[in-house]
């Protein structure tokens, strides 16, 4: 099964509403979202945390971009178990989840990003997390991989460039092998 958990920045970059990313990055995000609409599974949480974040940051009722249209498609298909899997995640404290595989690593994550990891880990197939623009994930992907969760960096050159700008005194971490 081809399933994925999709970080919100993939939708935002596909919309062209996340500044500082290359045309190639935007095209990649657009292509991956369009491919996902044609085939494969999107994994979200059953309490709609991910869908609420998507809705808050996009315009599914007035779609102008591919990310908006993707969310509209996702909302229309959320009850279709062949295209959307919903998993339960258990909040244990504000922004923390029992399904997050590593408590120490969870402390390093932005609270808004923790749900993506918890959802991937709660799903029986441990689907990859699509990540396009958040450079902090470069510091986390190796620990996540040790827990059985892969991070698929859709825009590796862009995310490494963002990392270099944010952390000029540190070399960008390596990327996962393709």
PLM-predicted stretches and their roles:
Residues 16-24, 57-61, 102-107:
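Short, flexible/disordered intra-domain loops and linkers
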Residues 1-2, 62-66, 177-178:
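An acidic, glycine-rich, mixed-charge low-complexity segment common to nucleic-acid enzymes
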Residues 22-23, 33, 106, 140-143:
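Sequence/structural signature of beta-propeller domains
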Residues 15-17, 53-58, 139-144:
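A short acidic (Asp/Glu
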